[in-house]
From Swiss-Prot:
GO biological process, one term: ribosomal small subunit biogenesis
Locations listed in the record: Nucleus, Nucleolus; Chromosome
Protein name, per record: Nucleolar protein 6
UniProt xrefs under Gene3D superfamilies: 1.10.1410.10, 3.30.70.3030
Known partners and oligomeric status: Part of the small subunit (SSU) processome, composed of more than 70 proteins and the RNA chaperone small nucleolar RNA (snoRNA) U3. Interacts with RRP7A; required for NOL6 localization to nucleolus.
Region (Disordered): 1-30, 36-55
Function summary: Part of the small subunit (SSU) processome, first precursor of the small eukaryotic ribosomal subunit. During the assembly of the SSU processome in the nucleolus, many ribosome biogenesis factors, an RNA chaperone and ribosomal proteins associate with the nascent pre-rRNA and work in concert to generate RNA folding, modifications, rearrangements and cleavage as well as targeted degradation of pre-ribosomal RNA by the RNA exosome.
Protein family: Belongs to the NRAP family.
Native organism: Mus musculus
Coiled coil: 92-128
Keywords, alphabetical: Chromosome, Coiled coil, Nucleus, Phosphoprotein, RNA-binding
Amino acid sequence: MPSAGERPAVKMGPAPAGEQHRRATEDPEVMELAFEGMDKEKAPSRKRARTEPPAEGLLQPVNLSREELYKEPTNEELNRLRETEILFHSTLLRLQVEELLKEVRLSEKKKERIDNFLKEVTKRIQKVPPVPEAELTDQSWLPAGVRVPLHQVPYAVKGSFRFRPPSQITVVGSYLLDTCMRPDINVDVAVTMPREILQDKDGLNQRYFRKRALYLAHLAYHLAQDPLFSSVRFSYMSGCHLKPSLLLRPHGKDERLVTVRLLPCPPLDFFRPCRLLPTKNNVRSAWYRGQSCPDYEPPTPHYNTWILQDVALETHMHLLASVLGSAQGLKDGVALLKVWLRQRELDKGLGGFNGFIISMLVAFLVSKRKIHTTMSGYQVLRSVLQFLATTDLTINGISFSLSSDPSLPTLAEFHQLFAVVFVDPSGRLNLCADVTASTYNQVQYEAELSMALLDSKADDGFQLLLMTPKPMIQAFDHVVHLHPLSRLQASCHQLKLWPELQDNGGDYVSAALGPLTNILVQGLGCRLHLLAHSRPPVPEWSINQDPPKHKDAGTLTLGFLFRPEGLTSVIDLGPEADKPEAADFRQFWGTRSELRRFQDGAIREAVVWEAESLFEKRLIPHQVVTHLLALHADIPDTCIQYVGGFLDALIQNPKEISSTGEEALALAVRCYDDLSRLLWGLEGLPLTVSAVQGAHPVLRYTEVFPPAPVRPAYSFYNRLQELASLLPRPDKPCPAYVEPMTVVCHLEGSGQWPQDAEAVQRVRAAFQLRLAEVLTQEHRLQCCATATHTDVLKDGFVFRIRVAYQREPQILKEVRSPEGMVSLRDTPASLRLERDTKLLPLLTSALHGLQQQYPAYSGVARLAKRWVRAQLLGEGFTDESLDLLAASLFLHPEPFTPPSVPQVGFLRFLYLVSTFDWKNNPLIVNLNGELTAEEQVGIRSSFLAARTQLPVMVIITPQDRRSSVWTQDGPSAQILQQLVSLAAEALPILEKQLMDPRGPGDIRTVFRPPFDMYDVLIHLTPRHIPRHRQAVDPPVASFCRGLLAEPGPSSLMPVLGYDPPQLYLAQLREAFEDLALFFYDQHGGEVIGVLWKPSSFQPQPFKASSIKGRMVVSQGGELVMLPNIEAILEDFAVLGEGLVQAVEARSERWTV
């Protein structure tokens, strides 16, 4: 043992490959994933790739001679192909893995710079002067510029302390194992405190931890004076408040290169192992509580584990070095697993399933021969995920130890003391001591999802598995923030958690976490699939500040993943009244429990929740959580921020805030079903009805604001008796907007149908007229017939029935040559008819079925459309294209599961829109699972071959495998890029709002359009905006729209499709389409945005036929035309007289 003047042994820098004598920390540095930085750096490049040619330096096709092209492969190439076939399931996967590992690994140059910095750190530590011996409670020797990085409660403790230079300084952890990851490189340095400053009973009553903290404080003060370091700060080691570490960062250009963490530890054999068994007590009740425990001293398993973790540094490093030393595949596997954990936020803070645990798990599986050292990183990843998916360490723990020593605890004893059990080779230390059951259940669940994804061998499996982040707000249906954390002190008192507080050193958050989650899991019952929690890492702090208190650790956030089939249940059934379990049920639920008699005659305890609409039923967990936390944990609802339905307000009718419209949609669908039965049973038609199909967003539950039964107030209309219809009065506000719901009615085939397209149209027109007569005669329905459709008023809803003949699209395709030969060729008319009468009804039927399977689909699709239209981009996207985007989130949710609530689905919609590579990939929406994997591969190949002929956004369905019919007419490349940019901006803003424990603030922020980008703003008067109440910011008061609460004396056909702003827009586009683009939110927008087309300001040659909107000027002796802006702006106002309130020319944005 060296004396104060002797030079300590030092081990620095990376050890040679294969060296077995390395030391490791029990918990190597928690690495920040490279992709957090990469996302910011690469996002722009990803967008540039859509519009710009390949950047210089990217690989390009090479022209090879025929001899070079067909020459035999070399031995090296053959070996690589054979290895790829054995170790990876595809060449693409191997390339992706290799590229990812390149991104996260340290370069040799950076390693050399880090090694040099570590050598300098060692020299500085060796020069820190000693301190004379003093009592632990006498800390007057500490300089004024440093504070002890530990809460010393209780302050009085026996023992003495003196500082001596460390007996050994060792670089440990993932840096030496070559498994650390960029961009935030942390290097752990174990600083072994000399034996002479420790005493035999230092394991008792936090004495060891007090000495450890004082040792760090003295180091911190002296190292902070050194110009080598740009910053010297304290931090908690893996979130454990009893184990601070000292962070050192180099000065100058390498400031962001590395962070060195100094970790004091005791000599290897200083503590007697038998005293640190998890069943032992090392925190006396008399010392901690001020009173002795009359019966027995409770065990302190976590406290003992934290000491053992420091003791076992060397042992664990030896183990990992011997296993991973020269096995590159194992190192690659550990790196991939760390990426996997980080993307799922599983490795954060105290209790995280961190990189050290996963490294030890790899070593365990190697020892059990479930992993071989010759495996590739991908195979290691698969093997570990398979093990995690199929092994529940909360029930069946695992152990390195093969010892039969009776003095060692059994796995059963470990399970009594810890939620998750993974025992190290000593047989005494549980590596997962801090991991909660909830965290491990989440790890296991994610492993199951990942294995299913890998087994599917999807082309984008690697991207979804390792490159797609899964933040809690997107991964879980509901999120709960508990704030302030100080309230959990009352919870500990209510739940009588004194032993847990004693074990956790006063950390009331850790003490209460397990009991709280158990209560909520029991209360949510069959509704709950998974509960997770997130504790943000405690930030580092200055050495001259006191350490953060537990209440300053941020917020405790809980995430709930629900089972869709149980989420909306309004009753929790308990046992029968005469059963012994009934008393436990009443105690658990308190006053909410009541006796009820059920239809089968049974009298049972039950809890009934107040909820009628689907919106209210989705929020029943909110009632459960607030009730149980108040009852059992003394946490009032003022300390609970429940995030589950904030976005639902955007699709609520302002007059019906207790519903998000699913009931209104269901009412309209039932009315459609009734009408369908009437059509099927009609007897007065010459041909029978062969099929009735819906073809409207209402009938697939995706209409943003569902229609209500229309009961017109006739005082708002002039009546046209001869047509039995109404006409809006000009002196009244614009009446309510009524949109008819399209229904396609197929008639049976017959030889009487003509074979000429024009004749077919005439026959169809006759059927439309006859249909109106028969419906009026047989069912007394109000009908209005035209040549193309029949409008039918039923129960306040208007349906637009289109008669269809199955062969008409084919007849329209027939082209007759001069020689009389008939060939089939797609024409615009045939394609339009096929889309409207065949593809659209099939899509509506499929999406209707999707809604029955996933009740949240309606809310997700409607929120998505509400947001797109609120950005004034609704005209660029068809209803069907946005419905399919929403459907893809349910049919292809990987790496998630289908959302159970609209809020989560909308966040994922924004992520999909902003990250999908629209230029190089089609979005395949496999409705009803009709497309096989081979067919999807073929679709992607066909897409690449025909990319230049396809629209900028391509959405493929089983019925539309090539042409992307729903995006043929838009969006344009510019509109799509604008949507992508807006989604990329909105997502982080919205996520930050929803994860704010103080509440989301103004949730409508991301729905408000960016008006600053427009050249002209046309302001409309609300009097003539029929959907004014649907605005993102609904008005406090609006105009009466001529609707009665109850049906009037008679029922006339209301005015259909009357929306003055939309009619005005159509006029503007017709008149000025060559000069400007017009943007508007059809849901109550008060402003039309105008963008001048760049080409419109270019001088045009004079043409008398193109003089509209332009003025003639002379340039260079020639007459040219330029836009007459003043006249155009005046025309805007004239065309919209009575509707336009003002025209705001934002001339600072443009000049002629």
